Amino acid sequence: MSKVCEYYFAPQSPWAYLGHTRFVSLAKQHGVQIDIKPCDLGKVFNVSGGLPLAKRAPQRQAYRLVEMKRWSDHLQVPLNLQPKFFPLPGDPAAKLIIATKLAHGNDAALEVAGAVMRALWAEDKNIGDTDALAAIASACGHD
């Protein structure tokens, strides 16, 4: 029986971005198949008591930036702490990732997910824009 890990994440999450490459690498190293499943953090917040970033106390917002910088440095993953196009809904990016999974499989979807998150958090691109997403998919070799 093969090992499968269901990977729930939000494409616009800085934490998903920071951990994505390491997670995929660890799964491959240990023979674990990843079943990629983008999700809507807004719906998770509504049922779990979490707060969207804009509704958090200023102190928590500031500490979030400190932690993101610390983890970015520790993992040596480039990260723009305040990207031009954040916050934004993750639905368009999630739909691209799901479409890639259905058309080309999990590995292709994992590649596209990494590229989407890198585009937002390291390249200052708008992953809510369909033209930007089409360019990301094309750069990954998908139409």
In which residue ranges do the predicted regions lie?
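Structural alpha/beta surface segment adjacent to cysteine/selenocysteine redox centers
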Residues: P11, Y17-E123
